[in-house]
Amino acid sequence: MKKISIVGLGYVGLPLSLQFVRCGVDVLGIDIDPAKIEDLSQGRSYIDHISEDEISEAVGKGTLRVTTDFSELSGTEAVLICVPTPIGPHNDPDLSYVLETACKVAPHMPRGMLVTLESTTYPGTTDEELVPILEQGSNMKAGVDFFVAYSPEREDPGNPESKVAQIPKVMGGYTPACLEKAKSLYSKAIKTIVPVSSCRAAEATKLLENIFRSVNIALVNELKQTYDSMGIDIWEVIHAAATKPFGFMAFYPGPGLGGHCIPIDPFYLTWKAKEFGQTTRFIELAGEINTAMPDYVIGRVSLALNSKLKSIKGSKVLLVGLAYKANVDDDRESPGYVLMNKLSDLGATVEYYDPFIPVIRPSREHAHWAGKKSVKWVQEEITDFDLALVATAHDNVDYEQLLSWSACVVDTRNVTNGLDHKECLVSKS
């Protein structure tokens, strides 16, 4: 294949597009957001770790074209769908982006096209939801007239060692022929292909990966609270346990889960499991523990302020780090927003500092924070706060300065470990 389409030019679709371009495949990028199309057309990157020079070169050469028009995909040989799969207000799967994309793709599919879904979802989505829409809209038969596969995305934003080409790619086909077609395409851009027996097996693989993280993070979050009550530093314990060369993998506590995967994906399986009469108590308990962590952190904030004879109400609190993980500009599902909302509801004046997020972008979930700007990292601004709450461990924040400028710091990421804080009350939360 020499020309493909990729639908969804976000944190998954854009890096994947550029990787195929590097490997000599022309890419038509499609996104429903005109602002993204405008940025890419002008060589601008809206993702911090994606090079503008590489975008400009690809767009200039015509190896990457971008559009909002789905009809243009008819001139390509494959469509890779990389759209969001959020959850609803009751933790039920929201497949609307996937299904709407399928409806827009189907009428323009030429015979022999490969359609691959990369969005995380429950087992059965590709076979039971995607294929019927594609067949009805194209008037063709999957596995006969066109090919279908599922290959879950694996991205690690902010990790400079994580390269798209080097991350093994799991994939399953609707039929054996579909799998071979998908392997043929992805092997052009990805070093290692991991075939599995079906789309359902590939979908289940992705959920296992993310549930594994969710459950283990919940474990250390629970242990943190238990060890805190005993006066034991969980971070010291984890670092000591990590010296065991077998049978242990280190996970770390935090103020809550963030990102578009770990807080959401486990609930896709819990929802689907009910169809088969199965309960997923362990997975759901992990979700409860992780979801409750912001409340625990707020309690620690309250105790820290009380030690200074202050209450949350009327205090000025600075959230240090709004991105969901270190060294990225991605604030999707960030626990920082939960913390800001709770502190604000309790009567605190809340500001934030994040070198990766100078201004909060508009979103449906946090519309009331849109347009709010990060404070400046200068002493006269930082010292004005009653408490600083570290929620994200960005490497380019000077935590020694934070300790010297602040009277009180609640540290959820262990960034103050080993630093001098004689003049500052530090609470590890």
Q: What would you call each of these model-derived segments?
A:
Residues 1-429:
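Structural/interface elements that position substrates and couple domains in central-metabolism enzymes
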